[in-house]
Swiss-Prot record:
Catalytic activity: tRNA(Leu) + L-leucine + ATP = L-leucyl-tRNA(Leu) + AMP + diphosphate
Family: Belongs to the class-I aminoacyl-tRNA synthetase family.
Keywords: Aminoacyl-tRNA synthetase, ATP-binding, Cytoplasm, Ligase, Nucleotide-binding, Protein biosynthesis
Protein name listed in UniProt: Leucine--tRNA ligase
Coarse class of the protein's main subcellular location: cytoplasm
UniProt-listed GO biological process terms: leucyl-tRNA aminoacylation
The keyword Membrane is assigned to this record: no
Family matches, as PANTHER family: LEUCINE--TRNA LIGASE, MITOCHONDRIAL (PTHR43740:SF2), LEUCYL-TRNA SYNTHETASE (PTHR43740)
EC number(s) given by UniProt: 6.1.1.4
Motif segment ('HIGH' region): 42-52
Class of enzymatic activity (EC top level): ligase
Protein's organism: Syntrophomonas wolfei subsp. wolfei (strain DSM 2245B / Goettingen)
Length: 824
């Protein structure tokens, strides 16, 4: 049968078929095991890039595989649709953010459909729609009700380019994660979520996630940053003020020779002596314009100013000078440290620069007792010295003894500190979920009642590059009445960080049309947690941490039954071109639309899944795409040619009296079933699964040429070849499945199970090569040894003919695989 592989009409045909038949639509079914498969939903930028294609192709293989294995598969898609780019586009192009966003969604949805992804589009959601952000606001109210949402004045990260506040996690190397502008510090009233209340649970429960990459768990562990130590107070000389510090090394408290406050510390102004005031103010001012990275980098020069004030060491009564310095930050610990230059390198460098004494209190093997003789700090183990009654104790013993002494004397207490800070969620922008709070002169901050949600984001608004939220300029939005007393009041004009919207969207997918509550309890109890989550490692801290926090909170208020949102996590690598991440600025972007138009979605999917294991970076290769296209063309020709011989045959259950060639084809078929099943189901080794399918195709192609093929064996091989290939390249497999006499969609077929009997071999096929080029394929006894294989190869008619008159230099034998005759 001579039919051309017309991928365009084939792909359009089957995409329409799937949609019309609603093949991917699912409901809860207690009779079937569920499988919730989710790729991180995208920001609707308007165009898919190759990273999207890879992410969604990986997810689709898993979804199709699980469905064919009898699971009730939930595979939804939606849009993380609030955010700054829409607002910037509005200002730049005089177009409303909603118009820009919905237009982008339509285009990206069309592109996704051309990829043939098995999404249940009935569950589509967009976080910018009122029926969604109504419940984002509900989440805020619940957090507020439970004392986990609060407002305070804080030194915040301000992006002068985006004109908004950023969370700590959105600042990378002192710059805005999105636009790379250097951030500034500003004092602003901001809303926070108290994620720190969950720090220990977020840390402990990483142990419940064996299906997560260790790298991601380590990143979260480091971000939470648990440290054990003690917190104690020091009185300030000639003042009623008290200074509180946290230290992980209470054993070194006798070695404190100066204290350091962060320049932003509220005590700086109160304790500064008049003669130091000018210098201190100048230094504080200078620090306002330095980002955290520049201040705390190990390469950064340590700078500071003496305040003129002294603290009293509660352990020995010594006077300790109080400095301010660039390397101490207000938002870590208490914003104050005890400096022990003999045993901390940063303190040591600072002390040497400003001629501050260095006192040794931990003696290692070669540590001099005289601090003046130290060339660098000694942070290691040893025994306490110069420490009064604690002399002679080991570091570990000393830490316990000092904490015990402090607790008995009421000086301090053992405590745990975390690097994790509360989540700053206020954004001074328009295109986000409005914060449902009203400020009343009589009642103070008042929550908008639940029955009044959603608090709508006004659509008709003037877009200008304001230095504050545009909502502040819209009287009909911010002027309101107090829900409590009815008097005139003002609305909060900040909107929520978009990460709030994405911290619970996976719950909403379980029942996206629910109008009275965020999700149906019955639905989330059936579907949650997500069984497989797929997305980039760049979300390891931000999104994944926030999603875990929300899930634990929703469990605590008894609306969810699970405490972790994602059972397994796959972080796929990037798609590179010329060894660099694809980007417009580098001019190395490959358009998925062009690739699909030229080669088809099946080819694009096959290449991107074959070129590299999913967790590794993938180098784009035009030759690789062409190779995938050639393979699909070969499959098309092969199955088309075999179709007439098998389309009217029933599937055989028994295969008696097979000759060696038929046995070998059955062996290859069932070995491939076993390999592909394990590679997809256990390891996500899609590249090796595809390689095995290619080998089966080659074996089938070779078998096709024999005089009297066993058609039931051929049918079994063809049917399984198509089923195994269908999660990777579904359109061509649907078409060939139909062509070979099947009425029902290949998607509805059961995944095959291998026959152990077929894997018991008397003979196996090996390749015969001459100088690395394949010249023949032959059947040999399964237990043939090296010498026997050498003899078989040299006696082979093709090998003898092609090596006549040549010198055979050596024979390379790989038992069970090949014999390579090297001749010259």
């Amino acid at each position: 049968m001579d039919r051309k592989y017309d991928f365009k009409s084939i792909e359009a045909k089957w995409q329409a078929y799937w949609e019309n038949k609603q093949l991917f639509k699912v409901e809860e079914d207690p009779e079937k095991p569920k499988y919730y498969n989710l790729e991180m939903f995208p920001y609707p930028s308007g165009h898919l890039h190759m990273g999207h294609v890879r992410n969604y192709a990986i997810g689709d293989v898993v979804a199709r595989f699980k469905s064919m294995n009898g699971f009730n598969v939930l595979h939804p898609m939606g849009w993380d649709a609030f955010g700054l780019p829409a607002e910037n586009a509005a200002i730049k192009n005089a177009i409303h953010p909603a118009t820009w966003t919905y237009s982008n969604i339509e285009n990206m949805k069309r592109q996704l459909k051309t990829m043939g992804i098995s999404y249940d589009w009935d569950r589509e959601l967009a976080t910018c729609k009122p029926d969604y952000y109504k419940f984002t606001q509900w989440m805020f109210l619940k957090l507020y009700e439970n004392k986990l949402a609060y407002k305070k004045k804080s030194a915040v990260n301000w992006c002068p380019s985006c004109q908004t506040v950023l969370a700590n996690e959105q600042v990378v190397d002192g710059a805005c994660e999105r636009c790379e502008a250097v951030i500034e510090k500003k004092q602003l009233e901001q809303w926070f979520f108290k994620i720190t209340d969950y720090a220990q649970r977020l840390l402990d429960d990483l142990a419940l996630l064996p299906g997560w990459p260790e790298k991601v768990k380590t990143m979260q562990k480091n971000w939470i940053g648990r440290s054990e130590g003690c917190e104690f107070s020091l009185h300030i000389e000639d003042s009623d003020e008290v200074l509180t510090v946290f230290t992980t090394r209470p054993d070194t408290v006798f070695g404190v020779t100066y204290m350091v406050l962060a320049p932003e510390h509220p005590l700086v102004e109160k304790i500064c002596h008049p003669e130091q005031e000018k210098e201190v103010k100048a230094f504080v001012n200078k620090m306002k314009y330095l980002n955290e990275m520049a201040r705390t980098s190990t390469e950064a020069e340590k700078e500071g100013v003496f305040t003129g004030a002294y603290a009293i060491n509660p352990m020995d009564g010594s006077r300790i000078p109080i400095w301010i310095a660039n390397y101490v930050l207000m938002d870590y610990g208490t914003g104050a440290i005890m400096a022990v230059p003999a045993h901390d390198q940063r303190d040591f460098e600072f002390a040497r620069k400003y001629d501050i004494p260095v006192k040794v209190v931990i003696k290692g093997e070669d540590t001099p007792l005289d601090g003046n003789l130290l060339q660098e700090s000694y942070p290691g183990d040893g025994h306490m010295v110069n420490s009064g009654n604690f002399d002679g104790l080991t570091v570990e013993e000393g830490q316990k003894a000092v904490i015990k002494f402090m607790e008995e004397k009421g000086i301090g207490q053992g405590t745990v500190n975390y690097r994790l800070r509360d989540w700053l969620i206020s954004r001074q922008r328009y295109w986000g979920a409005p914060i449902p709070i009203v400020y009343c002169p009589e009642c103070g901050p008042v929550a908008v009642p639940e029955e009044e949600l959603p608090l709508y984001l006004p659509e008709d608004i003037d877009f200008k590059p304001y230095a504050e939220s545009p909502l502040k300029h819209l009287e009909r939005f911010y002027k309101t009445t107090c829900p409590s007393c009815g008097k005139e009041a003002l609305r909060e004009t900040d909107t929520m960080d978009t990460f709030v919207c994405s911290s619970w969207y996976f719950d909403r997918f379980c029942s996206p049309h629910e109008s009275k509550q965020p999700f149906s309890r019955e639905a989330v109890d059936y579907w949650m947690p997500v069984d497989q989550y797929i997305g980039g490692v760049e979300h390891a801290i931000l999104h994944l941490m926030y999603a875990r926090f929300f899930t634990k909170f929703l469990f605590d208020i008894n609306v969810l039954s699970c405490q972790e949102p994602f059972t397994r996590l796959l972080t796929q690598g990037m798609v590179l071109k010329d060894n660099a991440k694809m980007s417009k600025s580098k001019g190395n972007v490959v358009s998925p639309e062009e690739i699909i138009d030229t080669y088809g979605a099946d080819t694009a999917r096959l290449f991107i899944l074959f070129a590299s294991p999913p967790e590794r970076d993938l180098e784009w290769s035009e030759q690789g795409v062409e190779g995938a296209f050639r393979f699909l063309n070969r499959v098309w020709r092969l199955v088309s040619e075999l179709a007439e011989g098998i389309k009217d045959l029933p599937a055989a259950e028994h295969f008696p009296e097979l000759d060696s060639e038929a046995k070998n084809l059955r062996f290859k078929t069932h070995a491939t079933i076993k390999k592909v099943t394990e590679d997809i189901g256990e390891r996500f080794n899609f590249n090796t699964a595809i390689s095995a399918i290619m080998e089966l195709s080659n074996t089938l192609g070779a078998y096709k040429g024999i005089k009297k093929p066993n058609w039931p064996v051929v049918k079994e091989a063809v049917d399984n070849l198509l089923i195994l290939l269908s999660p990777f390249s579904p359109h061509i497999c649907e078409e060939l499945w139909q062509l070979t006499g099947h009425a029902e969609s290949i998607y509805l077929q059961k995944w095959p199970k291998y026959d152990p009997e077929a894997l018991l071999q008397e003979e196996i096929e090996i390749v015969l090569q001459i100088s690395g080029k394949v010249r023949d394929r032959i059947m040999v006894p399964v237990d043939a040894g090296r010498e026997e294989l050498e003899k078989i190869a040299l006696d082979n008619p093709k090998i003898r003919e092609l090596t006549r008159g040549k010198e055979i230099v050596k024979l390379i034998v790989v038992p069970g695989k090949l014999v390579n005759v090297v001749a010259k």
